[in-house]
Amino acid sequence: DEARRFQPFIERAIARFRDQRADSVSRLRLTPGRILDIGCGRGLMLSELKRRGWESVGTEQSPNLAHAISQKTGLPVHSGPTLSACRFESGEFDVVTLWHVLEHMPDPVQTLREIHRIVKPGGFIVVEVPNLQSWQARLGAGVWFHLDTPRHLYHFSASQLQHTLAEQGFRTTDIHTFSLEYGPFGMCQTLLNRLTHTPNVLYRWLKRTKLQSAHKPPLHWRDTALTIACIVPVTLVAVGLEVSSAIFNSGGIVRIVAQKTHPYA
């Protein structure tokens, strides 16, 4: 299955994490509602929510990808260069989610403004992005794993994201900076990046793509050997640092749940 990007044991973990996302969405309402997942990927979370009785809708920028996801899952998946191009009705959704998507948007403020329009009064937005003011971002600087240039166009601290949401008419109801899915690994790969010449060696191992790629710098044997030698101690240090950073609200990932206020705050 070409849609599976990672090694099988990682794919199983991803499926479980998508179920956990569905759990977090389900807790926002007493009864299932209508959800839009912007940048829905393979539609794993939406499929699980559909199984639980939600009306699930997704978006992807690529028309071909949107069609393929829709064919595979049976979900309606819209495509367009911007969210506005999808032409959703005002107040159409109870919940809109963006999981590691907002940082890819050319105009995140306009995206949030459009979300405010299509969310019902009292509805929710869930946004998860890398945390620019995290310990791992500060430790990694230019080799921070989640920096991911040029794919990431913007980065936010927790306070910046909260302020931006408030300006577009959303009141924060929950915020935290620990992600079991992305936080410890992000710290681990960032620390390894400080040791190796080539970045993201471990991440490239875990993907199903070839380690040597025309689109990535070649792996040097010293980087491979250093990663193998250091992976266990660095992982232990990374987990400790990431858990500690989250205690001080400086974890690698920030997730905010916010409720629509009307009109703009």
Give a label for each model feature.
Residues 14-17, 250:
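Hydrophobic (often cysteine-bearing) scaffold residues that line and stabilize catalytic clefts
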Residues 264-265:
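Membrane-interface junctions at the ends of membrane-embedded or membrane-associated helices
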Residues 17-143, 150-170, 255-261:
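Conserved SAM-binding loop
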Residues 10-15, 226, 230:
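Short acidic-aromatic active-site loops that bind/stabilize oxyanions
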Residues 1-8:
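Active-site hotspot residues in diverse enzymes, especially metal/ion-binding acidic/histidine motifs
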Residues 84, 106-114, 124-261:
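S-adenosyl-L-methionine-dependent methyltransferase catalytic module, highlighting the catalytic core
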